[in-house]
UniProtKB/Swiss-Prot annotation:
Family matches, as InterPro entries: Class_I_gatase-like (IPR029062), PRibForGlyAmidine_synth_PurQ (IPR010075)
Keyword entries, A-Z: ATP-binding, Cytoplasm, Glutamine amidotransferase, Hydrolase, Ligase, Nucleotide-binding, Purine biosynthesis
Protein name: Phosphoribosylformylglycinamidine synthase subunit PurQ
Taxonomic source organism: Pyrococcus horikoshii (strain ATCC 700860 / DSM 12428 / JCM 9974 / NBRC 100139 / OT-3)
Pathway participation: Purine metabolism; IMP biosynthesis via de novo pathway; 5-amino-1-(5-phospho-D-ribosyl)imidazole from N(2)-formyl-N(1)-(5-phospho-D-ribosyl)glycinamide: step 1/2
Signal peptide: none
Quaternary data: Part of the FGAM synthase complex composed of 1 PurL, 1 PurQ and 2 PurS subunits.
Protein role: Part of the phosphoribosylformylglycinamidine synthase complex involved in the purines biosynthetic pathway. Catalyzes the ATP-dependent conversion of formylglycinamide ribonucleotide (FGAR) and glutamine to yield formylglycinamidine ribonucleotide (FGAM) and glutamate. The FGAM synthase complex is composed of three subunits. PurQ produces an ammonia molecule by converting glutamine to glutamate. PurL transfers the ammonia molecule to FGAR to form FGAM in an ATP-dependent manner.
The UniProt record lists the keyword Nucleotide-binding: yes
Any single Gene Ontology cellular-component annotation: cytoplasm
């Protein structure tokens, strides 16, 4: 059975939902306090929340904890690493993904459902999706405006779109360059995304579109 560590920093608040989403997808998951080792896990998820209360910058303090050194080693081995919302911010602060998450173009906290277009299905996180598929997931962030000077440094996986899949300025909730909602490293095994797939993993939550992120990882690792 594929087993994931869901990292818990002080201020993390999406860990329980993430564990349940992984279990619904057919994997095993445990909440792991950031001072514990993650070396024996098949993959790692850094969930959302407000680690260290977003002091300095969102994700800045968490990115400098010892556990991130182990996560870097796992990433270099090719194991899947997923950062959701604050987890994405932590991955960029730790230089596991290029770019940075800046304050939203309208400087306020955004909490709403958005549409996403899946543009790269050749990753462990998306291979159960169809290329061009439009999915619906929620966002909840104040610093989700992704900036990168050269987008060729990453693989764009999700883009904010309208419900028909058109990539428009109106569909971009936070000002991210190229409407980027999620990217991987060039190898494809480290994904950062601002939308919350764990909050779209059950029909009673309003959407199951995010469950395929976790199902994709589990099935990919079984291959």
């Amino acid at each position: 059975m594929v087993k994931f560590a869901v990292i818990v920093f002080p201020g993390t608040n999406c860990d329980f939902e993430t564990v349940e989403a992984i279990k619904r997808a057919g994997g095993e998951a445990e909440r792991v306090w950031y001072k514990q080792s993650v070396k024996d896990y098949d993959g790692v998820v850094i969930p959302g929340g407000f680690s260290y209360a977003d002091y300095l910058r969102a994700g800045a303090i968490a990115a400098r904890q010892k556990v991130m050194e182990e996560i870097r080693e796992l990433a270099e081995e090719g194991r899947p690493i997923l950062g959701i919302c604050n987890g994405f911010q932590i991955l960029t602060e730790a230089n596991l993904l290029p770019g940075a998450l800046r304050p939203n173009k309208i400087p306020r906290f955004l909490c709403k459902w958005v549409h996403l277009k899946v543009v790269d299905v050749e990753t462990p996180f998306t291979y159960l999706y169809e290329e061009g598929e439009v999915v619906r997931m929620p966002i909840a962030h104040a610093e989700g405006n992704y900036y990168i000077d050269n987008p060729s440094k990453v693989r764009i996986v999700f883009q904010y779109s309208d419900e028909k899949g058109s990539i428009t300025e109106e569909a971009n909730p936070n000002g991210s360059v190229l409407n980027i909602a999620g990217v991987t490293n060039k190898q494809g095994n480290v994904l950062g995304m601002m939308p919350h797939p764990e909050r779209a993993s059950d029909r009673f939550l309003g959407s199951e579109d995010g469950l395929k992120v976790f199902k994709s990882i589990v099935e990919w690792m079984k291959k």
